[in-house]
A protein has these predicted regions:
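Terminal leader/tail segments of proteins
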Residues: 1-147
Length: 147
């Protein structure tokens, strides 16, 4: 719904762990005006300059807690992501990305929060990849960013 606002301008950058550049990060906004419980956030489809970064490379930081995997986020049933808040999406990429301009392709994987559907238990047991979810966001969005 608010796809033009999915990332915070100027937030795309490399990050370090233990003195080494470990990957890149970007501040993300929820594309749902009501916000949602974190357990419904199932990760992101992330591609930069034609390279896809799978769910296993991603961590999510929100609500003043350390970055967590989306397996951990799936258990945060009582923790909410409010529309006004940005979260930080970390993507492991040893050495980070080169300085300069990049093309970021992004899609949020959000489960629907409007009551129980027949497919919901299957999605909980075998969550589809973010790009394969039939949730709120159906398209990949493209952003020109710079480190």
């Amino acid at each position: 719904m608010f796809d033009a606002y999915l990332i915070k301008d100027g937030s795309f950058q490399n990050y370090e762990e233990n003195g080494e550049t470990a990957g890149f990060k970007v501040d993300v906004h929820i594309g749902e005006y009501r916000g949602c419980f974190l357990s419904l956030v199932r990760g992101y489809y992330v591609e930069v300059d034609g390279v896809e970064y799978p769910l296993e490379t991603q961590k999510f930081e929100i609500n003043n807690k350390a970055p967590r995997t989306f397996e951990e986020i799936a258990k945060a049933a009582w923790e909410h992501w409010d529309y006004d808040d940005y979260a930080t999406l970390y993507v492991a990429c040893p050495g980070g990305l080169a300085k300069g301009k990049h093309r970021l392709c992004l899609m949020q994987g959000l489960m629907t929060q409007y009551g129980w559907q027949a497919h919901d238990q299957e999605w909980i047991d075998n969550t589809p990849l973010p790009r394969e979810m039939a949730g709120k966001q159906q398209e990949v969005y493209y952003f020109d960013v710079e480190i």
